[in-house]
């Protein structure tokens, strides 16, 4: 056990040294970054994929564009129960916010929880959107997640009575092109890429790592 602990400690020291000498850092994070905040990931044994609930459909169906269109009421019932939480930033979020104050750091996240910004990070690229942003599909009026959470059944716009849709990338929907290109540019410019909390199974987000031409990649899982 002592040798394993020594190895872990040495890796931490090595990572700190890499961070110290790097000029442009990209942190590329997935669901595992937020599990310490109590948010379910997707593929672990306790994640959404293996969730046994009152819903008969798997999570990727419940969170698909076609399900949103065809079963809007049930979509929002599921979405409000599992996607909108009272989670708070954990130590990883807080450390990255602290690091941003002294280093040129870009955070690229596949998460939609908005916890990086809550921790204080400014330079965050959200590949799959955020639960914090919701817009009327008719007039475009903005609503926060509390309005969605507190709405009865389907959330409707106070101005025009249109349905409000979360600004998140559902299954069957393309990733926001602007966010993807911005993330690609950040990775192309970086000399240190830190990948954490992701299995790199989700396309096209996983293709971004092929645009890294820097010196060091660190994988934390």
What are these regions (language model features)?
Residues 2-221:
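Conserved catalytic core of sirtuin-type NAD+-dependent deacylases
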């Amino acid at each position: 056990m002592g040798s394993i602990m020594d190895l872990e400690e040495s890796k931490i020291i090595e990572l700190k040294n890499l961070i110290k000498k790097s000029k442009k850092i990209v942190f590329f994070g997935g669901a595992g970054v937020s599990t310490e905040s109590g948010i379910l990931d997707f593929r672990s044994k306790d994640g959404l994929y293996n969730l046994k609930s009152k819903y008969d459909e798997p999570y990727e169906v419940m969170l698909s564009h076609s399900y949103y269109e065809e079963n809007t009421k049930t979509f929002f019932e599921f979405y409000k129960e599992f996607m909108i939480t009272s989670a708070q930033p954990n130590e990883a979020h807080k450390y990255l916010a602290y690091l941003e104050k002294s280093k040129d750091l870009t955070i690229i996240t596949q998460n939609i929880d908005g916890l990086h910004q809550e921790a204080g990070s400014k330079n965050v690229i959200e590949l799959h959107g955020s639960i914090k942003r919701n817009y009327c599909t008719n007039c475009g009026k903005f609503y926060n997640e509390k309005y969605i959470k507190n709405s009865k059944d389907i959330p409707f716009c106070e101005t025009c009575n249109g349905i409000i849709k979360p600004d998140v990338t559902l299954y069957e929907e393309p990733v926001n092109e602007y966010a993807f290109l911005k993330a690609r540019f950040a990775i192309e410019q970086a000399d240190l890429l830190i990948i954490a909390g992701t299995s790199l199974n989700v396309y096209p987000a996983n293709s971004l790592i092929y645009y890294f031409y820097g010196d060091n990649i660190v994988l934390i899982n």
